[in-house]
């Protein structure tokens, strides 16, 4: 099975280190379903959709973005629903959406420190042609907290920051006692902290 079950309402797809595909989450409510992060590419998102089909689960109407990093956001354009992010994340995505994905531009971002070698290497592994990358902003933006009633279960979003990046958002599902943290508890690869 592509997706692993935490409960009859919460599932996840494990990460894949080779191409830096992060864990993706899924919360099924009686009215709506939510995805946690959209993944690092349309191919990653497609595999997630295949996992939903395999389990007989509906595609999510919403996707919550935990932070701006490429591996969590570069499939937003391909997501077949409404995306939600904190204002801070959205502002960063707005900046990244102007980036060009030529070899020269990618190299210049490494030199300037705007991007890091770890991401550059994994982007090139995930994308046959990085010029296909299209970064977009979220459809819905929240300030610090947002609660979504999915029907029988809630998703409580909270901007918490953390050691990984200042725009980290957590997703708490209190009825299921589940917390998706994205990478909020990881080190900052950009500042190597």
PLM regions: where:
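Active-site metal-binding motif and surrounding structural segment of the metallo-beta-lactamase
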Residues: 43-89
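Active-site-proximal loop/helix segments of hydrolase catalytic cores
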Residues: 154-193
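Conserved beta-strand hairpin/beta-sheet module of binuclear metal-dependent hydrolase folds
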Residues: 3-50, 169-183
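Metallo-beta-lactamase
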Residues: 5-6, 96-159
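Active-site environment of divalent metal-dependent phosphoester hydrolases
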Residues: 41-43, 68-74, 90-93, 164-167, ...
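Active-site neighborhood of phospho(di)ester-bond hydrolases with catalytic His/Asp-centered motifs
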Residues: 35-39, 60-69, 84-86, 159-161, ...
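A short catalytic or substrate-binding loop motif that flags glycine-/basic-rich loops and adjacent residues
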Residues: 17-19, 140, 161-165
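Short loop/helix-cap segments at secondary-structure boundaries that form the rim of catalytic
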Residues: 4-5, 73-80, 149-151
């Amino acid at each position: 099975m592509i997706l692993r079950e935490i409960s009859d309402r919460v599932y996840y797809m494990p990460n894949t280190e080779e191409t830096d595909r992060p864990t993706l989450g899924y919360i099924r409510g009686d009215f709506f379903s939510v995805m946690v992060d959209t993944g690092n590419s349309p191919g990653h998102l497609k595999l997630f959709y295949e996992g939903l089909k395999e389990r007989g689960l509906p595609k999510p109407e919403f996707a919550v973005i935990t932070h701006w990093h490429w591996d969590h956001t570069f499939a937003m354009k391909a997501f077949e629903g409404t995306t939600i992010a904190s204002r801070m994340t959205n502002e960063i995505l707005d900046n990244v959406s102007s980036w060009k994905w030529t070899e020269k531009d990618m190299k210049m971002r490494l030199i300037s420190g705007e991007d890091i070698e770890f991401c550059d290497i994994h982007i090139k592994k995930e994308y046959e042609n990085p010029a296909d990358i299209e970064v977009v902003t979220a459809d819905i933006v929240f300030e610090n907290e947002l609660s979504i009633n999915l029907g029988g279960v809630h998703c409580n979003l909270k901007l918490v920051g953390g050691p990984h990046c200042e725009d980290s958002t957590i997703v708490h599902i209190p009825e299921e006692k589940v917390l998706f943290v994205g990478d909020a508890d990881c080190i900052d690869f950009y500042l190597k902290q």
